[in-house]
Amino acid sequence: MRRAPATTPRAVRLALALALFAGLAAPGARAAEPAAGAGAAEATAGRDPGRDLGRETLAADDGWAAAEGGTTGGAAADEAHVFTVRSRGELVRALDAGGDTPKIIRIAGTIDANTDDRGRPLDCSDYATDGYDLTAYLAAYDPRTWGGAKPSGPQEEARRASAARQAERVEIAVGSNTTLVGLGENAVLTGASLRVDGADNVIVRNLHLRDAYDCFPVWQPNQGGLSDWKTAYDNLWLRGATHVWIDHVTVSDRGHPDDREPTLFGRNYLRHDGLLDITNGSDLITVSWSRFADHDKAMLIGNSDSATGDRGRLRVTLHHNAFENVVQRAPRVRFGQVHVYNNRYVVPENAHDYRYSWGISTESAVYAENNAFTTPGHIEAADLVKSWNGSTLHQTGTLFNGYPVDLLTIHNAYNSGSERDLTADVGWTPALHGRVDSAQRADHDVARGAGAGRIR
Ligand code: CA
């Protein structure tokens, strides 16, 4: 963030500071000192210097989170519940303040969740306890000697105890009637797993959410025939959450890409789970103008075929988001009525592990309009959609490398033997949404406008 130049007269800087504090514009001061005015504008995030993102609410027609009362987050907070936080400790204290009283929490600079109460950084060795050691863990549960049973015994117990110590630092709960917003263009929360668990009316905007890194992945042999490393943390997990608006966030593994992790027991030693997972009866969610990047499993909506309590819930709108260099789940859906419009998908030239974008699973009802995909030559339109126990997909206006395609027809023509044909009738038509642009227009606008630091 640019700062007011040192030559700015003290009185002008003071006037600006007071104006910002009061949430008022100070046109005289800015006219006298344009450079300082630009700095002040960025301090409130956005080009309009009078704009206070914390006080903004979701527009009346903007997706599922606008239904049934809408989403206001902490916009109604009194002055005692407006916080600017710069450390994990300050963030957690602000989130805890006043129970469900509306609150606005502004994140300034970079906050690392992997820090102790005095703000000192913690690494994986600081959490390890009871003799946990990766080399010993690998020796204990090597499938060639341990076999296919779930890990148990001293090393697994030590892993669990160590993982609990990390969870205590990085799992951060966000309660009802909260707005969490980044100040300026470079507000970062790294290492955290934000959890909106059983809460209602939450807004998260203008934030970089990075690297929810699991120090202690667990080996899970033979899960449905496939053994794999399982990791604990999503950057953002909505669990039984209602009325949530996620807007202009950038979520990624930045700092620790999984493709640089070793292969252990024949599998990538994954460190990250989802970027944004929406599960356990969550409902009425809008995700807009956000960027999901450089990651394996981006977004899971519904986490189990047997979670029939999700029936009639998991209603989500995804619009004007960028999914760039993600391997799968953009999103993968069970049960929900999910409106996917005007999103931009980019698979880079060097992506050799791409799996699919839209996952159509049990009782899902995805209504997709005017989305744009850009992929390298070895990826075909038939690769974009994958179904497991899914039966419907509505899609229109899809653009694939600049050409219109009908992904439903292509899926049914080229699906593998294990997938059944999908029908176009998803049983609903979205009513709450803004203007639906052409895929070409959306692709262009999202490339320029999605993600943290880009609210205009
Ligand atoms: Ca997850």
Predicted feature descriptions by range:
Residues 1-37:
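Secretory targeting and sorting signals
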Residues 39-77:
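N-terminal low-complexity, Pro/Thr/Ser-rich intrinsically disordered segments
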Residues 61-106:
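Acidic Gly/Asp/Thr-rich repetitive segments characteristic of extracellular carbohydrate-active
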Residues 89, 110-113, 185-186, 378:
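Acidic glycine-/aspartate-rich tracts in secreted/extracellular proteins
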Residues 93-100, 115-179, 187-205, 211-222, ...:
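Extracellular beta-strand-rich solenoid/capping regions of secreted or surface-exposed proteins
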Residues 176-186, 200-213, 234, 240-257, ...:
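Right-handed parallel beta-helix
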Residues 332-456:
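Extracellular beta-rich repeat passengers
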